[in-house]
Amino acid sequence: MSLLSALTSISKPMNTSSKSSVSSKNASGLSMGSNSIACGSCGGGSYGYPGAGLLAIVDLNVNIDIDINLSATRSYSCGCN
């Protein structure tokens, strides 16, 4: 190995990072009330707000990234289903 290639390999270390990810969806949920008018005569429905999902990505090169996603999407389910 020449001196130039030895210096190059020292200045550019091999990329041996490995990543692991942990994901949790709908860790908690919030359900609010019922609405019998929107469902007609088949019974009440409910609005739901999905809970916050947490996504954590850990990089073994001493980098830690944490991403918290708050979903503001509202879903409605009717008692007729």
Curated annotation (Swiss-Prot):
Residues 9-31 have a biased composition (Low complexity). InterPro entries: HssA/B-like_chaperone, HssA/B-related. Transmembrane segments: none annotated. Residues 1-31 are annotated as: Disordered. This is HssA/B-like protein 3. The lineage of its organism: Eukaryota, Amoebozoa, Evosea, Eumycetozoa, Dictyostelia. It holds the Pfam family Coiled. GO terms for biological process: sorocarp development. Belongs to the hssA/B family.
